[in-house]
Amino acid sequence: MYSISLVVNMQCISAYGSILSLPLRSNLFSVRKLSSFPHKSFSGQHGKLVRMKATPTRACHDQESNRKFKRLPLSKWGHHFLSAQVDVSEMNALAQEIERLKPEVGEMLMFSSKSIESTKKRILFIYMLVSLGVAFHFEDEIEQSLEEGFEKIQEMIAGEDDLYTISIMFWVFRTYGYNMSTDVFKRFKGENEKFMESITSDVKGMVSLYEAAHLRTTREDILEEALSFTTRNLESLARAGASSPHILMRIRNALCMPQHYNAEMIFAREYISFYEQEEDHNKMLLRFAKINFKFLQLNWIQELKTLTKWWKQQDLASKLPPYFRDRLIECYLFAIMIYFEPQFSLGRVSLAKINTVFTLVDDTCDRYGNVSEVAALVQCVERWDPDCMDSLPDYMKTVFKFAWNTFEECENAGIMEEGLSYDVQGALEEWEQGDVVPTFDEYLEIGGVEVTMYVSIACSFLGLGQSSREQAYKWLKSRPKFVEAQAKRARLMNDIAGFEGDMSRGFDVNAIMYYMKQYKVTEEETFTRLQKMARDLDTTVNEEILKTTKSVPRQILKRAIDFGKMIEFTYRSGEEYTHPEGRFKDHITSLFVDLIRL
């Protein structure tokens, strides 16, 4: 969804050879090919290759049939935010109260006692700060507390048999990159080596164990068991409806989207409502969380007003056929998932604009352009020269101008002094020879590079300062296993969610099709296996995060992690970006329309 499509590239290879690539560069980007990035060599011992002649698809038909595109749902939001009114005096008052309450909350975190019980309470309090969406105010204090706490981990867990406490401590330490051992959960098993049924009566403990289980790494069987055990029991509780309403909502939200995968502010909106209904909630902490959230909401609404005005000025609807997805607000929601904090306003707005460019280019290639037009557009973007537009049809000139102007805006705003360029040319050359369809594993490697991290995550770093961006790009260029696993997982989720749409448009360049052809299995069995493969990649991602924490600054690693959450959010219940009903609409409403009540 964020790039010139691999589908079109592969369709065009036999006709156009190596000119087809995945560029992302303007004069502000240094010219770097993907071939300059270390590539894993494909094994000389391939699985069985599937050889076939290239067959024309809808994108390769004549001009008339190629223009038979499916009209997608219009934006539900239109110019809604253009008329939004934000009271600046209210924002100033909220900012002042945040600054007044912040030291008091900080004292609750950093109280002087260094006893084991106090340290334990501090870790539990960190979970509250994260869940309520205010942890970014106290990152230094949190890191200090966790570093001190992890040194005392054995003392803290000794004799501790409260499921909630153990699970929350595990979640917090793992989330911040501290590799707390899973052995701590053995105390909740009986003589039969299974989790004791008695713990099912501790509903909050069960939810916390469920959340902790999603931070499992490879070969952590006890957490696999915990996930199965808690999922089964929580689903039963949700069906029975016997708990209090706010507990039931917490269970259902967790089953729908575990906290580990959820966007920080989406989870915070839900958790604030949950925490308010807890009898033992801290009134001052709750007020701080609410004031902070409303302040963020007003900032976001201001930015959406600016973005909506910008989008209206582009007037793409009058310049292009209605083949593309009008998803400005959804693009901004994605940006919120990467950068929600007030200080990242410029990066957030720029990222939202860039997301609209990627969406338009992707739809142009996937849904409307024919092979020769796409090839011409790719060449033009590769050269990044407005003079080359003469070779483009009129509608593609509009697409190129929009991309050019948007990147120029970001450059002029000072958000893109340095960047990366990616080109799939080298990776695709092996596929060009002899009409050979790549093996499933080869497709996953190159497909993952193309559609997810190695382009989109580079743009996700744009909100960081220049020195941090340079460090982030250097890390990304090393092709870390964490990003590689995220990319493969995203490729699988994208292809699983988009399979029916791909087939309806005649595109068979899809992980499901490659797997079925290579391994001679049914579509149903393929879906089952690939879904398991995606789950297994979860554990690899978690493991690599723990390995990477000490070598990569948290502000860089967090953007990559949050990008993975964005992918999870988009595809967990289908291709919701294309059809943004349900959760997309609900979350946009809760974040940008319904202001939190103080």
Swiss-Prot record:
Localisation per UniProt entry: Cytoplasm
Record note on cofactor: Binds 3 Mg(2+) or Mn(2+) ions per subunit.
Metal-binding keyword on record: yes
UniProt motif DDXXD motif: location: 362-366
Tissue expression notes: Expressed exclusively in siliques.
Record Pfam families: Terpene_synth, Terpene_synth_C
Main location: cytoplasm
Protein known as: Terpenoid synthase 1
